[in-house]
Structure formats: structure tokens, C-alpha cells
Amino acid sequence: MLYLNRSKFQQFPFHLVTPSPWPIVTSFSLLGLTLTLAFTMHGIIGNIYPLLLSLLVVLLTMTLWFRDIVAETTYLGDHTLAVRKGINLGFTLFVVSEVLIFASLFWAYFHSAMSPDITLGNVWPPVGIEAVQPTELPLLNTIILLASGTTITYSHHGLIEGNRKHALSGLTITFWLIVTFVLCQYIEYSNTSFTITDGIYGSVFFAGTGLHFLHMVMLTIMLGINYWRMRNYHLTSTHHVGYETTTIYLHVLDIIWLALYICFYWWGV
């Protein structure tokens, strides 16, 4: 083998990423989304169109970035065992950071709920706040999420065992369960008697449940991508890192929702 040909092969298992515009483009698009969201909430921007445009740019850059990642793992073979271990480690740290974010919101909630001062009427929920009843839509959403955890596990085991029919059917059911959850959560928000500006209760309630809602929207996109990849035979029984991280992501969001339901809906009422 000639030296020139031999030099094309790596002597290590790690992926040297080629120059990509997506990290810097995504950073600026997220900055634009944050600024337009803050300006819209404070009334500096009089309409919602700049916010929607920023969100569209973020979704577009994410789509293009995910396209490159799919090409690297499926067609170029860049995701070796060492690379997959690194991805799993990075995703684990991401989950830890998400748990810490929600922990800070629970801290803020209990800080006010366990010792309400005179400005809150010395009661929790504060005077004038009609809390969402835990036996209505929140209970239905809890059942839906628990069911989705079961169906995604069924799908995952089907993929591991090489049963394509079970894997696809379980993933399809999971996708529609999560879509139903998102719609029910939207209906709940549309019918609440308070908003995010109604004191500490409204702020913490919508910050906690709203952040979880945004994660569920992201989960819907991830499930859709995995369904498309599974239909196109991108995933195998031994190589499905994206699908596996999506499964873990769903289970983590299930646990966080159970904590939100117990603390914000059941105990908080």
C-alpha cells in the first residue's frame, strides 16, 4: 500500500469533525431567540413575529446540523465505539444539567410554598389564585406519560431483538402519546385563571411546567427523527445511539413530570 493511501486511514478511533458552520450559527440563532423572547415578554416588541422568525431559524439550523450528524454516523461510519462512548458521556452530563435546572425551580417553589409571607396572604396558593386541579388534565397527562414510557421500552426491546414490526409500532404509539400530552398541556395553559405574571406562584408554576413542556416538544421532534431513521434502516440492533438517548430522555422527563405533578399540582393545591 502506498504511503499516500495509507495516510488516509486514521490510527485512532476518534472522530475529527470537519469544519462546520452549525455551532456558531446555532449560537447566534439561540441568542436571537432569547433576546426576542425577552423583548416580547417585556413589551419592547409589539408583535410575536420576530419571536416566531427566531424560532424558525433555530429549527432550521438544528435540522441542518442533525442532517450532517446522520450522514456522519450512517454513511461515513465516523461513530466508532469510542465516539459512541463519548456521546453517551456527553448526554449523561446533559441530563445531569437538566435535573439541576429543575432542582432550582423546585427550590424556588418550596421556598415560597412552605413559608408564605403576608404578601401572599400567608397561604399557598396565594390569595386570588385558583390552582389547577390535579384530578383533571394533569392526571390524564400523567397516565399518558407513564404509558409512553411503557411503549418506548417495548419499541426499544423490539429493536434490540431485531423485531422491526414491534420496534416501529411501539415508536409510533409513543410519538402520538407525546403529541397528545403536548396538546393537553396546551389546553391546560389556555384555561388557567392565572398567568406567568401573577406573582411567585404563576412565575414558578409556568417556569417549571413550561420548561418541561418545551422539552416535550423537543422530544416529539426527536421521536419523529428516530421513526424516519428506523423506517429507512439507519438503526440496527447494536448501533442506535440516537434512539437510545431519546429513550433515556423520555424516561427522565417522565420522572421529572411525576415530581412536578406531586409537588406543583397535588401538594400545591
From Swiss-Prot:
- Matching Gene3D superfamilies, A to Z? 1.10.287.70, Cytochrome c oxidase, subunit III, four-helix bundle
SUPFAM superfamilies xrefs: Cytochrome c oxidase subunit III-like (SSF81452)
Its name, as the record gives it, is: Cytochrome c oxidase subunit 3
Q: Where in the cell is it found?
A: Mitochondrion inner membrane
* Coiled-coil stretches: none
Which reaction is the catalytic activity of this chain?
4 Fe(II)-[cytochrome c] + O2 + 8 H(+)(in) = 4 Fe(III)-[cytochrome c] + 2 H2O + 4 H(+)(out)
Principal place of residence = mitochondrion
User: What keywords appear on the UniProt entry?
Assistant: Membrane, Mitochondrion, Mitochondrion inner membrane, Translocase, Transmembrane, Transmembrane helix
Going by the entry's taxonomy, the superkingdom of the source organism is recorded as Eukaryota
Q: What does this protein do?
A: Component of the cytochrome c oxidase, the last enzyme in the mitochondrial electron transport chain which drives oxidative phosphorylation. The respiratory chain contains 3 multisubunit complexes succinate dehydrogenase (complex II, CII), ubiquinol-cytochrome c oxidoreductase (cytochrome b-c1 complex, complex III, CIII) and cytochrome c oxidase (complex IV, CIV), that cooperate to transfer electrons derived from NADH and succinate to molecular oxygen, creating an electrochemical gradient over the inner membrane that drives transmembrane transport and the ATP synthase.
Family assignment?
A: Belongs to the cytochrome c oxidase subunit 3 family.
The UniProt transmembrane annotation reads: 21-41, 44-64, 90-110, 138-160, 167-187, 205-225, 248-268
- Record membrane topology: Multi-pass membrane protein
- Pfam families per UniProt: COX3
EC code: 7.1.1.9
Molecular functions per Gene Ontology: cytochrome-c oxidase activity; ubiquinone binding
Q: How does it assemble?
A: Component of the cytochrome c oxidase (complex IV, CIV), a multisubunit enzyme composed of a catalytic core of 3 subunits and several supernumerary subunits. The complex exists as a monomer or a dimer and forms supercomplexes (SCs) in the inner mitochondrial membrane with ubiquinol-cytochrome c oxidoreductase (cytochrome b-c1 complex, complex III, CIII).
Q: Give me the Gene Ontology terms describing cellular component.
A: mitochondrial inner membrane; mitochondrion; respiratory chain complex IV
